[in-house]
């Protein structure tokens, strides 16, 4: 791919940044799009966008052409994430949300396999993207055929739970709700933990004395652990609450980080990486599913969009930040970085629970949140009136100055 496009190796980072920025912007705009299209139509449009972007990747003759198609890829990915997570959090049980997120692990394992198969058959990286586009096209057709089912399910639980009936809540107003900023930072540190684990665990093993093949295998084992952990956590979700699963997952990650720094036999290190994957598994889907109970269904779409933005921002910033630190010190400090991420995550989760219980009182969250939003709306209207009044006074002063100058 690099040789085909005559691009430097660092260009892959630029492509990733374009997709990630597009995903962040798209996730923040998704609540408005959900009111306009509904969940089913928006997911169909988003999948179709990613399919078009994959076709564009496969046929790109230059790197800058790939950058152009990275924009719809990011927009589609962000809208899919927010809309599906919001639908699952409101309409499905916790176990279904865990199993939905387990499919991410399947895709993470399947993607490299498709590229390897395409290379083996002689189609190269372009053939792999065309195959991905074909699969996404099939999913888009299935989504189009299932649109009536989406509408029926949304209205089955009550018209007030339909995205079209959700109130128009601005980003500024939502951030005034107690716990919303903490929710952003919770997902920021979770993604920092998960992405840093997947990106740097192989390099860490090689630095500890393992063969590069073992390091590559550890990355695959980490993704497999997340997938298996989410499948298993779906069954545990039948019996335990979302927050118990979150706390259990963080506890497993803490144990994994502690064992990493102990002077144990070398073979224990890959086992610890699997432990990190298992610990990460229930945290993300359980936090997502707890969102409507924490902030109310009216604010769920906006809250999840903020959480997704925090997640993507963490995945953009923290891995290269650790790379900078590792370049100045050593990759051996990787467990210390993980400890900082998991400590920050635990602090945010505990503080988020405290704030939402104290200030919102989960049983009355929806009513309290709507009161907060009404207060914010009143303050915004007051600021708008004040700005209009200031503009009117400035225009009046300009007219008076103009009249005085003419009088002279």
Where are these regions (language model features)?
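C-terminal transmembrane helical hairpin of 12-TM major facilitator-type secondary transporters
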Residues: 240-287
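Helix-loop-helix hairpin linking two adjacent transmembrane segments in secondary transporters
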Residues: 100-151
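Conserved MFS/SLC helix-loop-helix module at the cytosolic interface between two early adjacent transmembrane helices
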Residues: 25-64
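Helix-to-loop junctions at the C-terminal end of transmembrane segments
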Residues: 26-38, 229-241, 326
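A late C-terminal transmembrane helix in Major Facilitator Superfamily
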Residues: 297-331
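Extracytoplasmic gate region of multi-pass secondary transporters
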Residues: 178-227, 231
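Cytoplasmic helix-loop-helix junction between adjacent transmembrane helices
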Residues: 69-104
């Amino acid at each position: 791919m690099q040789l085909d496009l005559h691009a430097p190796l660092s260009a892959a980072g630029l492509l990733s940044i374009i997709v990630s920025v597009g995903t962040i912007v798209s996730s923040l705009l998704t609540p408005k799009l959900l009111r306009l299209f509904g969940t089913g139509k928006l997911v169909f449009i988003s999948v179709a966008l990613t399919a078009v972007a994959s076709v564009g990747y496969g046929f790109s003759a230059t790197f800058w052409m790939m950058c152009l198609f990275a924009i719809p890829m990011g927009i589609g990915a962000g809208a899919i994430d927010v809309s599906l997570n919001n639908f699952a959090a409101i309409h499905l049980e916790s176990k279904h949300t865990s199993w939905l997120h387990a499919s991410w692990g399947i895709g993470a394992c399947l993607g490299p396999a498709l590229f390897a198969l395409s290379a083996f058959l002689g189609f190269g990286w372009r053939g792999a993207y065309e195959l991905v586009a074909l699969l996404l096209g099939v999913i888009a057709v299935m989504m189009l055929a299932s649109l009536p089912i989406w509408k029926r399910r949304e209205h089955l639980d009550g018209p007030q739970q339909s995205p079209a009936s959700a109130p128009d809540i601005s980003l500024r107003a939502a951030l005034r709700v107690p716990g919303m900023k903490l929710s952003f930072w919770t997902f920021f540190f979770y993604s920092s933990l998960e992405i840093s684990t997947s990106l740097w665990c192989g390099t860490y093993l090689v630095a500890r004395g393992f063969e590069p093949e073992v390091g590559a295998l550890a990355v695959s084992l980490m993704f497999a652990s997340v997938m298996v952990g989410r499948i298993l956590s779906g069954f545990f979700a039948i019996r335990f609450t979302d927050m118990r699963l979150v706390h259990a997952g963080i506890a497993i990650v803490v144990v994994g980080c502690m064992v990493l720094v102990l002077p144990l036999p070398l073979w224990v290190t890959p086992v610890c990486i699997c432990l990190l994957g298992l610990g990460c598994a229930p945290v993300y889907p359980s936090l997502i599913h707890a969102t409507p109970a924490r902030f109310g269904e009216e604010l769920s779409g906006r809250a999840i969009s903020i959480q997704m933005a925090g997640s993507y921002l963490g995945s953009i910033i923290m891995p290269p930040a650790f790379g900078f630190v590792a370049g100045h010190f050593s990759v051996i400090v990787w467990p210390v970085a993980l400890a900082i991420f998991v400590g920050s995550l635990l602090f945010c989760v505990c503080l988020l629970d405290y704030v939402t219980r104290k200030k919102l009182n989960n049983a009355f969250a929806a009513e309290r949140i709507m009161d907060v939003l009404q207060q914010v709306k009143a303050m915004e209207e007051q600021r708008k009136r004040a700005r209009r009044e200031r503009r009117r006074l400035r225009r009046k002063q300009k007219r008076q100055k103009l009249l005085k100058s003419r009088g002279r």
